[in-house]
Amino acid sequence: MSLWHAILIRIPHINMKERDTALDILIDYEKNESYLNITLNHALTHDFSPSERGLITTLVYGTIQNRLYLEYQLEPHIHTRLKVVERMLLLMSLYQHFYLDTPDYAIVNEAVEIIKERRNKRAGGMINAILHSCFKETRSLDDLDHDERLSISTSHPLWMVKMFSAQ
């Protein structure tokens, strides 16, 4: 089932939250390699205020645009294979931590509630632990060589950074 169908099914029954919608879009993008702008625009045609639309757009594009940096920060805290919903929720949460002025307690609370709804209580505990661990230990880029540091900090593929550096 595509995101569009899922949204249309869910809308009449519950009042969707911005982060839930952003997560649905990110999951659809990851699983189906869908066009982000089309999926986002379709999701935003529903009853959202301008500020809610802004938050959804910021969360979706921000998470994707900074993905390499967010993955770099997440990587050492993952000790098991994550489901797509868990990985995308963690990346979106880390985006809020590093780039938005969202308090950590709010990020963790919202993430845990979302994952408990979608998976189970145990997954909520895992998300809680991973986020707290990530918030305590931010990885430095200083130990990386110049090209790797530039690749991760700008979230551009290493091959592209090397190509531009060589010119």
Language-model region placement:
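Class I Rossmann-like S-adenosyl-L-methionine
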Residues: 3, 7-167
